[in-house]
Every structure is written in structure tokens, then in C-alpha cells.
Amino acid sequence: MSWSRHKSLQRIRSFRASAPAAAINLSNFDLSYMTARATTIQARRKAGGKSEPLIFDVPPDSAVLVEGVHVYIQLLDFASAMTERERETEASHRRVLSMLHLNYAACDQVAEEFEAQRVDFHGARMHAVIVSPPGPGNERDRAERALAFADAAKRAIEEVGRTTENGRYSTRVRVGIDSGSAVAVNSGTQDEREPLFLGAPANYAAKLAEGDEEGVFMSNRIRKDLGLPQLSSFDTLAAERASRTSSVGETGLSANTSFQSKRLSDAAIMTAASRARNSFILNVGTDANFSFHRHTPPLSTIDFALLTPSNSVRMGLMSIFGDIDGFTKYVDECIAAQRIGEMVSNLHVIRSELAATLSQDFLGRKVRFIGDCIHGLLATGTSYETDASGSVVASVKAAGGMRSSFELCQEELGGIENLGIAIGLEYGETPITRIGIRGDRSVRCSVSRAVSRSEELQGGCTGDQTALGPTALGHAPTSIRRLFAGGVAMGLDAGSVDEHLGSPPIVRSGEVSAAAAPYDSGE
């Protein structure tokens, strides 16, 4: 397993040729677009097909510019559900997967009531966007619908948690809401056809959803759209994150008959919760129906289409998060300068090359793209056990390869010279499965402390840093630990990893020094 500049360059040029900037088909989500899509969806349903969201199955060489309201729903008690007496066990992983399946179903039930576009489920987070009614002049209507949707989703999750298995899956809920322009693009994952939305409002809504206090938290842009007083502070985001909204008690909302008419009644919430519970019983039943097996490495051979709750993987592995640092700002610049084709083409190439580096060069498995971030898994070992130390070494090499591939993309592509890639790595027992709506709208799911920690580590890195988590450091050979002073390595690319692992350290004792034996992956 190794990175090759020649192979990477060939792939990058091939990916760019498949979706050149000049050939990107850009659409605007306006009334004509929505009407055409609604007609297509209705015709497919009459022919026996399934219903689809208004924006769906966007081709890799296309993009849709959307004015919408972005809603991030965070399950606050997700982390505690993942452990049992401070330890991750098969039982605790079954419980947290059941919890996610149940709450994903509740969110989907409510989303249908508001024509909310489900974007992504990722661990404890759901991202949805309200895109209709489209066009300027409808900002208030979209904001009212988004707030009513957020209120309904929170209540439905609380209701289904309260009434299922004596509250075993109950959780507090926090929701962040923001509005603005974003670009809908292909998800990059063949079996998940909902598009990803790139741009500031999705990012900002996610930040508003961060925190320990439950409730619904709006940006000043949403407050403005709703005609509510905006918050004034030196730190606007902090003020918004501390200002919980009451859908029924807040001045300006309780008397807003248009908004109140959009809120779901208690009876409708109970119906949505009941349908989610029935879906859970049909597809999962109980925790015990999540059945785990090991997958013999390499993980690149995992077929997500074959995974179900009763056919799930669980094993020790490395979780890898790679995030394109500075990309949201780049998206906003491209929207403002009408360079969306450039951005979509560049993203297609970068994501494709990062995924190819992980899976082809280092035999890892991509789970999904989350905006401009890639989540992957990697392990070495046998059908009986994971080689933890070998997995750490392989993932560090993969991280180095991903950075080298990204830097090669910067050489080949225009406009991305100011971007970087932040990478987080951690080791732990981790389940891998598909949950949610059965069929082509089920979602890939891999959750564990290692997954959460690797994402946190990536979030704390700058665009030239790679971070290795404490569990991975504990399994790492000395040669790897030397690379990560304080758990973080700067500018760690394929060349520097290979050079370091191939060069013996100097061992000193008193006045005597000597070269230690070189690292041997078989030791």
C-alpha cells in the first residue's frame, strides 16, 4: 500500500476531464425548476415509482443554486447512549444504532409534512433544507416553515423517545437554523442520491446546533426574515447560540398567525411518532436484531448495499476524517463571482481523488462525504482480529497520501491555492451498517467514540495539520509516535511519512549514540 505521484496525477486529470468547469450545468432553483420537477415526480408516482425530493440525484457535472433555510438537528444524548459504564460494548452499539434508526425515521416522517429536503444523516446530526416556495420575496414563508419544521422534528423525536421501549432511546434535541445561498451538488456516494448543499448557511446552522442546551436556535438572518428583533453583540454567533427560541411564547411568534398555522398539532406529532415507531419495529424490532460480524481486511471490499441491521459489521479499525480547510469561504467567493462551475469541478476532482487515494492506494473504505469532508475507515489484520498497530501505521500512511493527493490537486487545479486539508485519525471498536428508510433512501452509518473523536481532532486542526487520537497513539509503534508530538503532525505528506519510517532514529546513552534498527511493519 503506497501513494504514487504518477497514479494520482493520472486520476486527477481523468476526474477533471469528466467534469470540466466549462461544462458544468448550473440551474437555479426557481418556480420553473420546481414546477418541472413536481411534474416529473408526479408522473413517476403515477407509473408506480417512488416519491422523490424536489432536488434529487444531481449529476456530477451539474449543480443547483438554491436560496433556502438550513436546519441542523442534533441529538444531545447520543454520546452517552454509545457507552455502557463508560465502555463501548456490542450492547451499547446496538442501543445507539437503534436510537439513531428510530430518530432518523421520526425526522423523515416530519420532513415529509413540510417538503423539507433531507440532505444528510451523520451520526447524531440531521441536515435538512427548506427550499420552497422558491424565489425572492418568499424568505418569510420559508423561514416560518423551517421554524415550524424544527419545532415539529424536536417534538416528534421527544415523543417517539418517550413512547418507545420505556424511554430507552429518549434524547434531548438542539436545532440550529440559518438561511442564504447554497449550491446543491452530487453527494459523491452512489447509493445516497440526496445532494449535498455547500455554502455558509449550512455551515452556520451546524454551528448554531453545537452546544449542550436543548432548544431551537436561530440566526439573525432568520430573525430578520421573520420580522423579529435581531440580537446585538460583539460576538453575534455566541449570542445566537445562547438565545433559545420558544415557538409558542416568544413575542412576535405567538401572535404570528401565519407561522402558528404551519405548526403541527399535538395529534399530528403523535401520528408522526407512531409511524416512526412502526417503521422501527418493522425494520429493527429490538436492539438484539442488530447482528454484528467481522469483515476480513481490507475494508475496501465492504459492500454497503449488502449491509442491514441484521447484517452489520463491528470491529477494531481506524476512523479517518479529512476536511478541506477554507472551502466554505471559497464557495461563497465562487457564488459571488459567478465561478460556481469552477467550484463544482474542483470539488468533484478533489473528493474523487481523496476517495481513490483512500480506497485504491491504501485499501480503506469511504463511508461518505459530508459537505467538503470525507469520512473513511481502514484496518489491517485477519478474519479473527485487527492488527491495531498495523492499522495505525497504515492510516498514517493513508493520511500522508491524502495530503499529497490534495497538494497535487492544488498544482493541477485553479483557484484553490489558499485551501488546506485537516485530517483526524483515531482507533476503536466501530460498527458499520445502513439504517433509516429501507431501500434506496437508507443511509450509511458508522458511529463510535473513535469516529466522534477523529472528527473532533480534524475540527481542531489547521489546513496543514494531521492529528492522531490518544487510543491510536497508544497502539502506535515508536516510529509513528515520534511523528506526532502532542498528537499533531505538521505538513505530513506521503514523502515525509515514507522518509521517516525508512530512516532509523538516533538512540543516545550518555556520550554514545547509534542508529536504531529501522521500523519493520512485521515486528
Curated annotation (Swiss-Prot):
Coiled-coil portions: none
Location relative to the cell: Cytoplasm
A cellular-component GO term for this protein: cytoplasm
InterPro entries in the cross-refs: A/G_cyclase, Nucleotide_cyclase
UniProt: Mn(2+) 2 binding residues: D323, I324, D372
Co-factor requirement: Mn(2+)
Residues where Mn(2+) 1 binds: D323, D372
GO biological process: cyclic nucleotide biosynthetic process; defense response to virus; intracellular signal transduction
Catalytic activity: UTP = 3',5'-cyclic UMP + diphosphate
Domain statement: The 2 guanylate cyclase domains fold into a pseudo-dimeric structure.
Protein name in the entry: Uridylate cyclase
Origin species: Rhizobium sp. (strain PP-F2F-G36)
